[in-house]
C-alpha cells in the first residue's frame, strides 16, 4: 500500500524471500536494520513481539543509532504498555520521535491498506506521518500523546479476540460432539445472536480443516499473557482471559503452537474434526 501511494520504500526482513517479493514490486532492499535506518526518515516496524522490536532498534545491527534526529519510529507489534512507554523514553533520549501504533486486520488488510491502527504519540510525529497512515490504514485512532496508550487499547482488543476464538472453538466442539452438522451449525450461528466476528472468520478454517497460520496459536499465548500480566500487577481478575489463555497453552503444548489460532479446537477430546479439503491445509 505504501508503494501504491508513491512512497520510496526501503525494506528489511530476516527472510530473504519476503524482501525479494517486495523488491519485485518496487521497494529497495536493505541488508540490515542499521542500513535501513541510515536511509529513511520514518521507520515502520511490523514484527511479532517486544524482543523483535528491541532487536530491530537496538540489536547489533539496530536502526536506532543510524536514524537522524527528528526521525519517526512507528512500532506496531503487540507489546505490553510498559514496554511501549519505556521505548518512547529511550527513543526520546536519542532525539527520535515515537508513535506507539499497534495494528489490527491481518496480512490481507495490510496489503490493501485497510488496517485499523491504534496509535499514540506527539502531534508533531503524527503530522510528519499523516500521508503514511493514509496509505496503510482505513482507520487511524489517535489515542493520546503518550506512548503506551495505543498498546493498552490493542491489549483490550486482544483480550476480546482471544476469548472469542476460544469460545467459537468450544461451541463448535460441543456441536460436533452433539452430532450437529458442522456447516449447518456455522450457518445458523452466523445469522443468530451468538455470532461474533471471530466466529465468522475462524470457524471456516475448522470447516475446511485448514490450519495454515494466518495468526498462530502462539500469538495468543503471548498476547493473552500480556493481558494477564498487566492485570495481575493491579490484582484485577480476568477469569475468561485466564481460561482462554490456558486453552491456547494446551494447544501449544500439544504441538499446535505454529498452526492457525483456530487450531485451539483440537484440544477437545472425543470429537472428529472436518478433514482438510482439496484446497485446505493441515
Give residue spans per PLM region.
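NAD(P)+-binding Rossmann beta1-loop-alpha1 motif at the extreme N-terminus of oxidoreductases
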Residues: 1-46, 71, 110
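Rossmann-fold NAD(P) dinucleotide-binding segment
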Residues: 33-98
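Interdomain hinge/lid region at the active-site interface
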Residues: 151, 160, 195-257
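Beta-strand segments within the central parallel beta-sheet cores of soluble alpha/beta enzyme folds
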Residues: 181-191, 242-246
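NAD(P)-dependent dehydrogenase/reductase Rossmann-like domain
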Residues: 249, 253-282
Amino acid at each position: 500500500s505504501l508503494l501504491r501511494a508513491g512512497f520510496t520504500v526501503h525494506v528489511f526482513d530476516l527472510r530473504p524471500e519476503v524482501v525479494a517479493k517486495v523488491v519485485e514490486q518496487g521497494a529497495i532492499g536493505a541488508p540490515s536494520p542499521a542500513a535501513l535506518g541510515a536511509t529513511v526518515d520514518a521507520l515502520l516496524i511490523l514484527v511479532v513481539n517486544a524482543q523483535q522490536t528491541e532487536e530491530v532498534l537496538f540489536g547489533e545491527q539496530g536502526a536506532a543509532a543510524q536514524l537522524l534526529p527528528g526521525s519517526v519510529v512507528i512500532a506496531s507489534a503487540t507489546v505490553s504498555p510498559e514496554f511501549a512507554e519505556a521505548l518512547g523514553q529511550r527513543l526520546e533520549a536519542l532525539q527520535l520521535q515515537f508513535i506507539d501504533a499497534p495494528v489490527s486486520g491481518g496480512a490481507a488488510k495490510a496489503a490493501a491498506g485497510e488496517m485499523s491502527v491504534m496509535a499514540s504519540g506527539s502531534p508533531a510525529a503524527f503530522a510528519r506521518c499523516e500521508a503514511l497512515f493514509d496509505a496503510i490504514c482505513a482507520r487511524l485512532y489517535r489515542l493520546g500523546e503518550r506512548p503506551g496508550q495505543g498498546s493498552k487499547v490493542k491489549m483490550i482488543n486482544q483480550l476480546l479476540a482471544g476469548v472469542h476464538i476460544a469460545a467459537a472453538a468450544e461451541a463448535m466442539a460441543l456441536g460436533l460432539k452433539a452430532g450437529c452438522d458442522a456447516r449447518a451449525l456455522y450457518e445458523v450461528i452466523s445469522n443468530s445472536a451468538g455470532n461474533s466476528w471471530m466466529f465468522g472468520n475462524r470457524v471456516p478454517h475448522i470447516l475446511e480443516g485448514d490450519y495454515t497460520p494466518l495468526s498462530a496459536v502462539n500469538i495468543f499465548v503471548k498476547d493473552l499473557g500480556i493481558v494477564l500480566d498487566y492485570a495481575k500487577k493491579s490484582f484485577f481478575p480476568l477469569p475468561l482471559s485466564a481460561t482462554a489463555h490456558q486453552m491456547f497453552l494446551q494447544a501449544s503444548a500439544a504441538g499446535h503452537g505454529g498452526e492457525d489460532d483456530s487450531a485451539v479446537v483440537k484440544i477437545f477430546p472425543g470429537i472428529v474434526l472436518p478433514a482438510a479439503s482439496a484446497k485446505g491445509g493441515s
